[in-house]
């Protein structure tokens, strides 16, 4: 019935937040939570402050012996992946409670008991078949993709499939909501 081809974006978020003080942990959790509720906007870069990074790196210095320091771009990417991973998990969990859901990925998550893990789907030989044979193909874009029509949407439509996508501003420019 429903298919997702792609990563689950399982991150090292809990590992990298473990040594942090409670304020920093809460602040990062707030960023992930807020970004997860916003479509059509990307908040993460503006919410990562120099003060936050300085405090995080002080906390890391207390436990790291290799001189590890978190950079702004690395933190931004980790938070974007964590947000996307949570969204994909939630969508798959909710849909799999009511429909047959297949995940084509090298990632697995034991918590998704009702999802059928199908393994890797080759872009040229297997993906077109998945897209054309599924009733609904999911597109849940990585949060760093701010604009543009995701390639996955074009892939699915090019194979004659039906795609259900997260909001991307450009989709409204080229498609009529509720009609196409």
Language-model regions, residue ranges each:
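Conserved, well-structured beta-alpha core segment at the onset of a catalytic domain
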Residues: 1-15, 123
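Extended, charge-rich helix/loop segments that form flexible
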Residues: 10-90, 94, 98-100
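Catalytic binding pocket for nucleotide-activated donors in carbohydrate/polymer assembly enzymes
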Residues: 1, 82, 103-180
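Short, flexible loop/turn elements at secondary-structure junctions
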Residues: 6-9, 99, 105, 142
């Amino acid at each position: 019935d429903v298919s997702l081809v792609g990563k689950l974006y399982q991150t090292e978020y809990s590992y990298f937040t473990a040594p942090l003080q409670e304020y920093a942990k809460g602040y990062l959790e707030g960023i992930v939570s807020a970004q997860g509720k916003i479509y059509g906007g990307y908040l993460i870069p503006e919410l990562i402050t120099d003060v936050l990074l300085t405090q995080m790196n002080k906390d890391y210095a207390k436990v790291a012996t290799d001189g590890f320091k978190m950079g702004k771009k690395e933190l931004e990417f980790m938070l974007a992946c964590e947000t996307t991973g949570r969204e994909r998990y939630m969508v798959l969990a909710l849909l799999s409670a009511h429909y047959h859901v297949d995940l084509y990925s090298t990632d697995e998550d034991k918590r998704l008991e009702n999802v059928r893990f199908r393994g890797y789907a080759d872009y040229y030989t297997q993906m077109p078949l998945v897209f054309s044979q599924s009733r609904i193909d999911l597109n849940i874009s990585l949060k760093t993709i701010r604009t543009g029509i995701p390639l996955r949407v074009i892939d699915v439509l090019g194979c004659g499939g039906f795609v259900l996508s997260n909001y991307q501003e450009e989709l409204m420019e080229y498609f009529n909501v509720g009609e196409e």
